[in-house]
Amino acid sequence: MPLTRALATTVHDPDARLAELLLKHADNLRGAYMHAAAAVTARTSGKTLDALRSAGIEALVGDSAGIGASRRLAVATVADKGANSIHYCDLDRWLHWRESWPQELSGLLARLEKSRPAPMYACLGRTTRAFGTHPKVQVACEDATNRGVSAAFRRRSDVTAGSAWLSADGARLVLSRSVELSNATDGEWPAIAWLHDPRRVLQTWCEGLEFETATFHSAEVEAAGGRDEWIRATYDTPASWAHRLGLASATVAAVVRVLGTGETA
């Protein structure tokens, strides 16, 4: 069967922070994927919507019940068009990846497609270096998530990088069983595939999934006196810790729910 590559993504960009890099990499986006779909919030800037369309990305505008539902919508849209090599990636992640590690990103899908046994799902995780570039709250809470997932899968895992790969049958399976409304799909999706066939769930380590958010806040970083100062002021807050700790718990709970007792094959 011929490969039909697609990008599925989600976008919330009221300040048009993504528009410049979207336009810069529009030709690459059109060339890399036969189909691309983005679930876009209603508050996203018209400038970003125009940039998405320039890049050949179908913009599915509307507020869903949560990012989990938005992710399912984007994946379902490209799967319905016949895609059988689907890269899900948060758009800010993808743009930073393309900007900073273009060769790694360009070769990623071919690498996964050649894997044997043929995978249905790949967790696209971060190398030790890439993971360490994130704010302390993100490192601590996502490390806790990944420890829980690793215990369930009995292997080192990183499921919280906002990126994954699905085959056609992997997409059908995940879409038929996924119910999480939040980012807890990070754990739910690979758990669904793992329950079906652990041999067809890959873990891949990527440099380009390093911390991306500062890329889109250059003015704020400068005003704060530098990247470290901006990260500290933005992320090292009680509210941020509460949110991320809650998400860590929800993500591991989703894995336990899918796997039943938490035991695996």
Question: Can you say where each PLM-predicted feature lies in the sequence?
Answer:
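Short beta-strand-to-loop acidic/aromatic patch adjacent to the donor-nucleotide binding site
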Residues: 83-96
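Conserved donor-nucleotide/metal-binding helix-loop-beta segment in metal-dependent transferases, i.e.
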Residues: 94-130
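Short, well-formed alpha-helical segments that are part of the catalytic scaffolds
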Residues: 7-34, 44-46
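A recurrent flexible, glycine/aromatic-enriched loop bordering the glycosyltransferase active site
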Residues: 129-136, 147-164
